[in-house]
């Protein structure tokens, strides 16, 4: 669900920012999100979790996260330019730059410390690099918008961003707690993953002047 929303967001970017260069990047990112969708589907199949995926609505932490991420993507449908700028900011910082990265870290740690999931780790490493690029492009876009329209980035915008950041962390924290519900990992403690997410969130905020 979220990958579909992400693909649509980048594919629609040109309609709100009709610059050929932005359109080219948006369409390229949308295509890569199709590959991400296929890669994640393959991972579910390899892990034998396809049946579990159908039960996602029965897992509060995952349902809440899907609802949160979907809501963030829906903000892009706004007609107001200021609100659209906010949607680009939230989307780039909290979906592309933070969401999924705790899971990337956990799976790759099994390969690093236990020599497990090597094939999956290679796919995730490639995917995470692309997600990072998407987030960085969005951050550059937000900073350009801020230079051109500084009046949009007022106290109300700051409050919206900080509120969204807190919601993002709360959502990620619940997913991490769910992943670790059967116990901690000696090679990657739960608190380390939570601090990793906080670090990415803080870096994301600083990158756009917050």
Task: Give short role names for the model-derived ranges.
Residues 1-210:
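Non-heme di-metal
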């Amino acid at each position: 669900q979220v990958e579909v929303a992400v693909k649509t967001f980048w594919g629609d970017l040109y309609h709100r920012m009709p610059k050929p260069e932005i359109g080219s990047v948006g369409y390229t990112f949308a295509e890569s999100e199709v590959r991400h969708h296929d890669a994640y589907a393959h991972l579910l199949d390899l892990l034998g979790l396809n049946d579990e995926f159908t039960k996602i609505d029965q897992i509060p932490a995952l349902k809440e996260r899907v609802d949160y991420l979907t809501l963030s993507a829906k903000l892009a449908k706004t007609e107001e330019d200021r609100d659209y700028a906010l949607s680009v900011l939230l989307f780039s910082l909290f979906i592309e730059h933070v969401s999924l990265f705790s899971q990337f870290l956990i799976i790759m740690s099994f390969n690093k410390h236990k020599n497990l999931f090597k094939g999956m780790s290679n796919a995730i490493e490639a995917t995470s690099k692309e997600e990072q690029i998407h987030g960085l492009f969005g951050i550059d876009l937000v900073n350009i918008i801020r230079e051109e329209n500084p009046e949009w980035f007022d106290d109300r915008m700051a409050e919206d961003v900080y509120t969204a950041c807190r919601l993002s962390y709360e959502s990620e924290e619940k997913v991490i707690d769910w992943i670790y519900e059967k116990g901690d990992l000696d090679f990657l403690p739960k608190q380390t993953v939570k601090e990793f997410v906080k670090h990415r969130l803080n870096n994301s905020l600083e990158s756009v002047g917050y």
